[in-house]
Amino acid sequence: FKWAFNDQVGLVNNILFSLTGRAQIIPWLIDVPLGFIALLVAEIWMSTPFMVIILEAGILSLPTEPFEAAEVDGASGWQKFRMLTLPMIMPFVYTAMAIRSLDLARVYDVVRIMTDGGPGNRTELIWTYVYRLSFSGHNFALGSAMSYVTVIISFLFTWYLFRNVLKSRWEGQR
């Protein structure tokens, strides 16, 4: 992705030049808002397939009987989605969100490789900041404390999501 967003020979600038005919160089990894856009595109590109597989597994595991009954009752496609599909795949959505929230620590390598937190540490995320603080700034105590707090926040978010999954399963068994 660093090569794709390179301002001189990058694929994105070449595609934009081919489409628009304007030879304007866009500094994707140097400009702050564009740097975040480039990081976001790279991260979405890398994480979307796994999330789609989880959600597709959830959709394929849905029972057909409620949908057939809704069809007989004359429910529209939107009503079937809102009243049947969405509530039944919510455990899979919560699981995907929990995995994704824990996977956010992996974003460190994308930021480190593409922008290294620059320009001026403005595309820095929590894990790159903890790394820079601990190893470049030699402040191991603060870096360790920040990483513990971040892990605890991730744990609490995951606990909240799984609590909702268990609550929805408990209500479904009643």
Across the structure, where does each feature detected by a protein language model lie?
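A structural signal for multi-pass alpha-helical bundles of membrane permease subunits
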Residues: 1-174
